[in-house]
Each structure stands twice: as structure tokens, then as C-alpha cells.
Amino acid sequence: MATVKIALPPAAFIPASSNGAQFKVNAGTNFPVNALAFDASTAESVYAAFRAASYGSGNLTLTLAWYADTASSGDVVWGAQIAAITPDTDTQDVETKSFATASTVTDSHLGTTGQRLHSCSITISNLDSLAANDRVDLRIYRDAAAGGDTMAGDALLTMAELSYSDT
């Protein structure tokens, strides 16, 4: 049994046509940091597609690396959902396919430093009949309207990693 891991850097995502997270390149002191900026007051989304090569069974785990643009406290509610299509089998129109029910996680800013890197994981259990080698569309969003999302300012997503079992 092995774990398949798919790294998804910010450039792998397409912002939603309406309320999409902004792609940013922050110069940094020693190196640039690419990120997707999710607003505190507007629900913003990004999308990425991948092939579920060697998917076996079980839930997907989405690990997010993020930091606050300016805040040094508060909570961020992240959400994710997938839509899976089996090529040559499913009759669903690829342009109108619906997403499965979202899964969310609330992650707390650990304080003291505004641009401190944080990590959280979302267990995606609504799998939309996922099968090996499916085309999978992934949506990630910040649920700015959730009562538990209390962090002011942008949350900047620097990396996402999707993992699943091949058995």
C-alpha cells in the first residue's frame, strides 16, 4: 500500500470567473513567494484539475500551507470539494458537472507573527463516485461568511497537496 501525493502550487490553480482568489507574487527578502490571496469578506475560490492515477479507495486528504497577509490572530475556514468524471463511462457533460458536498476545516492563526506559515488538512469524504484514472476537478475556497472565520485580511495559500491510497 502506497500513498499517492499530488503537489499543487498556486500556479496550478485557475481563479473562479467571479470572486476568484488573486494570484500574488510577494518579493520577500531572500526569495519570491507565490500565493493565492483569499479575502476575509468575500467567498473566493480557485480550481485545479488532475487525474486520479492509481486511486484505490478511501478519502482524499488535502493539506494546505497558508499564511496571513497582515493578521496575527483569528481563524480561517477553508473548504474543498471535488467533481469526478470517468472518461468513456460517465455521460455527464464535463462543462456542467456538479461538485460533491464540500468538506471544511477551521485553522487558527498561531499568533505573534503576521506572515507565519500554517498548515491544515481537509478530509474530503464526499468523493462523487471517484474511481482510478478519473478526471477530478478540485475547488478550494475560503468560507468568509462562516461564523468561525474570524481572521481579518487575506489568507494566502502557498501550496496544496492532495493525497490518497492506491489500494
Summary of predicted features, one role per range:
Residues 90-128:
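Extracellular carbohydrate recognition and processing domains
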Residues 141-167:
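Proprotein-processing/basic-patch segments
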Residues 54-58, 67-75, 86-89, 146-148:
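Extended, low-complexity, turn-rich repeat/linker tracts enriched in Gly/Pro/Ser/Thr and Asp/Glu
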Residues 72-80, 153-157:
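Short coil-to-beta strand junction motifs in C2/discoidin
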